[in-house]
Curated annotation (Swiss-Prot):
One of its GO terms (cellular component) is endoplasmic reticulum membrane. InterPro entries: Mdm12, SMP_LBD. It is found in: Mitochondrion outer membrane; Endoplasmic reticulum membrane. It is a peripheral membrane protein. Component of the ER-mitochondria encounter structure (ERMES) or MDM complex, composed of MMM1, MDM10, MDM12 and MDM34. A MMM1 homodimer associates with one molecule of MDM12 on each side in a pairwise head-to-tail manner, and the SMP-LTD domains of MMM1 and MDM12 generate a continuous hydrophobic tunnel for phospholipid trafficking. One of its GO terms (biological process) is mitochondrion-endoplasmic reticulum membrane tethering. Keywords: Endoplasmic reticulum, Lipid transport, Lipid-binding, Membrane, Mitochondrion, Mitochondrion outer membrane, Transport. PROSITE patterns: SMP. The SMP-LTD domain is a barrel-like domain that can bind various types of glycerophospholipids in its interior and mediate their transfer between two adjacent bilayers. Residues 69-82 have a biased composition (Acidic residues). Component of the ERMES/MDM complex, which serves as a molecular tether to connect the endoplasmic reticulum (ER) and mitochondria. Components of this complex are involved in the control of mitochondrial shape and protein biogenesis, and function in nonvesicular lipid trafficking between the ER and mitochondria. MDM12 is required for the interaction of the ER-resident membrane protein MMM1 and the outer mitochondrial membrane-resident beta-barrel protein MDM10. This is Mitochondrial distribution and morphology protein 12.
Length: 430
């Protein structure tokens, strides 16, 4: 089923101009965080326009929203702003209900406080031999995501009263993605947290203090320690090393490990809040085709190295006059919020089938496996024009102009894929 969009009404007026300015500012901030080549200086995004040609939308499926869309990470959006919204109870990283004193305090019952930041001393036998014991396998889904902060993932400058942005950190694709696992009916593979696992859900990067979660686990090191009989009696460190090993009665003495409780594990991750699912929540999969005249203007300087390095900078203006893409869009409606993102070709192929994934890399679709071939990017074509450095016959007078155009196009593709493709998504408050 096709959908007609009143593109002029949606992109014009004060609201359309405000949205265009926020997108321009967002792309500009992204370019300021990019390490520029030596011959380029001062890239500025000056304008953005939606154009006059609307995209073509075709509804392919309806389903329940993705679980990621129910994570409540907006501290400025109070419960009272939603009609009939029940009070949300905090849950821990495993999805269990957490009392208020547990959610706000790292202490245990009776006022006992667990020192989660107490450093662990290396066993004496390990210091003596210089060989580190084998550690147990680490679940990469539990690594503190703020060890790898993305300082370049702010919200839309100018306020987020009606627009939000979410970007989790992940490096898996194809069949290893959550969507691929759900479509096959299999649980997520190793390295992905489960449905109740902790996920980063902050729109702005925050400094994370050192925590027990951010350190490698030492829970399995007891099985790798050498036995008492295998150590030499003449070892001067023997008496100290035996403190971390089981004794003859099978009891272990670990004076350097802070006390823990199975009901209150050491975890500095703040409890996440999940919004309640309701029957009226829904999600739409749309095949989106666009070949319009959306425009983006950038200015930069090309540095000339003659007669000396960076002798002079020539201003250059680049105009992106249109682009073409074919992808599957996801639009979810959850109580006054609209979540929007695109699916990668792998996820779209898994969920919707190869015929709706936008798979053909070009115009040749006669081959049997052409629908399985994934394009290098969802953006199939980007048209760009430069206003300096061209002769009358159309050839470039400055060789670095072509390099600059290529660099800008690569960055535009990268920003689009990182910020608009699931598991990244945008949230609009309505």
């Amino acid at each position: 089923m096709s959908i007609d969009i009143d593109w002029e009404r949606a992109t014009s007026g004060p609201d359309g101009e405000l949205l265009a300015e926020r997108i321009r500012s967002f792309i500009h901030d992204k370019f300021q965080q990019i390490v520029l080549p030596r011959f380029i200086r001062s890239v500025q995004v000056t304008s953005f326009n939606f154009g006059t040609i609307p995209p073509e939308l075709e509804i392919r499926d309806l389903s329940d929203p993705f679980p990621d869309f129910y994570e409540d990470d907006d501290e400025n959006f109070s419960d009272s702003s939603e009609e009939g919204s029940p009070t949300r109870e905090p849950v821990d990283r495993y999805g269990n209900r957490v009392d208020s004193w547990q959610a706000n305090s790292p202490g245990g019952p009776g006022g006992q406080m667990y020192e989660s930041n107490q450093p662990l001393r290396m066993p004496a036998w390990e210091e003596h031999t210089g060989i580190s014991p084998l550690r147990g396998p680490m679940n990469f889904g539990d690594i503190n995501p703020y060890l790898f902060p993305r300082s370049g993932t702010p919200g839309i400058p100018g306020g987020t009263s009606n627009l939000g942005y979410y970007m989790p950190l992940s490096g898996l694709s194809s069949s290893q993605t959550p969507l691929g696992a759900v479509a096959r009916g299999n649980p997520f593979s190793g390295g992905w947290p489960d449905a109740h696992g902790a996920r980063p859900s902050r729109r702005r990067s925050e400094a994370e203090p050192d925590s027990a979660q951010s350190r490698p686990s030492t829970a399995n090191t007891g099985n790798t320690l050498p036995s008492r009989d295998s150590m030499s009696i003449s070892d001067p460190h023997h008496s100290h090393a035996s403190q971390g090993m089981p004794n003859n009665q099978g009891q272990a003495l670990e004076p350097n490990i802070p006390p823990t409780s199975p009901n209150h594990p050491l975890d500095d991750t703040p409890p996440r809040r999940m919004r309640e699912q309701k029957a009226e929540d829904f999600q739409v999969f749309c095949r989106t085709k666009y070949a319009g005249n959306i425009s983006l203007s950038l200015t930069a300087e090309i540095l000339l190295d003659y007669p000396m390095p960076s002798f002079v900078g020539l201003p250059l203006k680049l105009n992106i006059t249109g682009l073409t893409f074919d992808a599957v869009a996801v639009i979810a409606y959850i109580r006054r919020r609209i979540h929007f993102c695109f699916l990668s070709p792998e996820d779209a192929d898994t969920l919707m089938g190869p015929e709706t994934a936008g798979g053909g890399g070009g115009g040749d679709t006669s081959e049997p496996n052409s629908s399985r071939r994934k394009p290098s990017s969802l953006l199939r074509e980007i048209r760009v024009e430069s206003e300096i450095g061209r002769k009358e016959n159309g050839k470039q007078a400055l060789k670095n102009v072509g390099k600059l155009e290529k660099f800008v196009l690569e960055q535009v593709r990268r920003i689009f894929e990182e910020e608009f493709v699931y598991p990244s998504f945008w949230t609009f408050l309505i």
